[in-house]
């Protein structure tokens, strides 16, 4: 495969077939409850050991909003509402385009972990400054930092 001179793609020098870059669409959701606490998670089987937010891939035929609602339900058992778009971020490490949202989990819903995905899901407050990932470039870290600063 060689770089094509006209397209942002790779071209097979033998048959001319073009292969375009693939982007994996992903959602991340910052879920807050009625007490303005933030739900943070830790992955069950990943090398990433910091706190994260609910996240997952967008499935074929699904909007990013539908994926955010589905991932929240699958991973935590929570029904979310008031979904508000935060921003997007290209993430070259995994060829992803990340769409982020802030949502609400109203009432006294019970967290039910999807244990093959998550090992921890817990509510935190703005006083839990040990969570602050100031030096991390990820949009997840930005969202957690903004929450702790009272800006999310």
Q: Predicted regions span which residues?
A:
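Active-site-adjacent beta-strand/loop module that shapes the phosphate/pyrophosphate-binding cleft
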Residues: 89-112
């Amino acid at each position: 495969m060689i770089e094509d001179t006209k397209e942002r793609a790779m071209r097979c020098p033998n048959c001319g077939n073009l292969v375009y870059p693939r982007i994996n669409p992903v959602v991340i959701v910052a879920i807050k409850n009625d007490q303005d606490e933030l739900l943070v998670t830790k992955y069950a089987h990943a090398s990433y050991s910091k706190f994260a937010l609910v996240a997952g891939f967008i499935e074929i035929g699904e909007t990013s909003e539908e994926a955010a609602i589905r991932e929240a339900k699958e991973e935590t058992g929570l029904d979310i509402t008031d979904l508000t778009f935060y921003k997007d971020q290209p993430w070259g490490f995994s060829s992803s385009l990340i769409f982020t949202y802030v949502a609400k989990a109203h009432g006294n819903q019970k967290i039910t972990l999807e244990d093959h995905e998550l090992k921890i899901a817990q509510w935190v407050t703005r006083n839990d400054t040990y969570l602050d990932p100031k030096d991390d470039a990820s949009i997840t870290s930005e969202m957690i930092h903004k929450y702790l600063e009272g800006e999310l």
